[in-house]
């Protein structure tokens, strides 16, 4: 699931800020995916759908299927996100894609800290501390040209008192 990147062309195997081949199991029905947009009309595309995939897509393939996908779109003007975000009923998640893996983790956590700051009233330091104590991190893709990692926080921790 992706939009056209701010590049002339990119391999369909490569994930990045635009989404792409992230191989993240949380990109699934019922969850919202937020993507930054660089081109008029976004030029959205989807593919490589899986019936099932473990974290990391260890052997390079998941349970690959043909699929018919129905999506709905909402334009959020001035959203200002830099990397894909995923929202489920109970978690906020951000995706970072890079090599080495540490860079992917850094991107994912930086984006999640920004989300907590911008939309949930946390200071940068408080968001960093919260993720240190209650955040999650998993590998979506570790077999393609670029690794994808997902940083997350349960929404129960977003209640400020």
List each language-model region with its residue ranges:
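Glycine-rich anion/phosphate-binding loop at the beta-strand->alpha-helix junction
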Residues: 1-77, 117, 124-125, 130-152, ...
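A hydrophobic, small-residue-rich beta->alpha segment in the mid-to-C-terminal subdomain
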Residues: 77-130
């Amino acid at each position: 699931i992706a939009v056209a990147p701010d590049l002339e062309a990119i391999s369909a195997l490569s994930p990045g800020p635009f989404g792409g081949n992230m191989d993240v199991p949380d990109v699934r029905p019922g969850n919202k995916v937020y993507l930054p947009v660089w081109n008029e009309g976004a030029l959205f595309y989807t593919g490589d759908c899986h019936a099932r995939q473990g974290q990391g897509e260890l052997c390079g393939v998941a349970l690959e299927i043909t699929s018919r996908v129905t999506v709905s779109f909402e334009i959020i003007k001035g959203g200002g996100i830099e990397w894909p975000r995923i929202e489920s009923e109970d978690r906020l998640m951000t995706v970072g894609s890079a090599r080495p893996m540490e860079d992917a983790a850094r991107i994912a956590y930086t984006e999640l800290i920004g989300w907590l700051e911008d939309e949930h009233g946390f200071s940068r330091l408080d968001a960093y501390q919260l993720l240190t104590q209650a955040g999650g991190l998993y590998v979506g893709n570790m077999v393609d040209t670029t690794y994808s990692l997902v940083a997350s926080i349960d929404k129960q921790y977003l209640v400020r008192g």
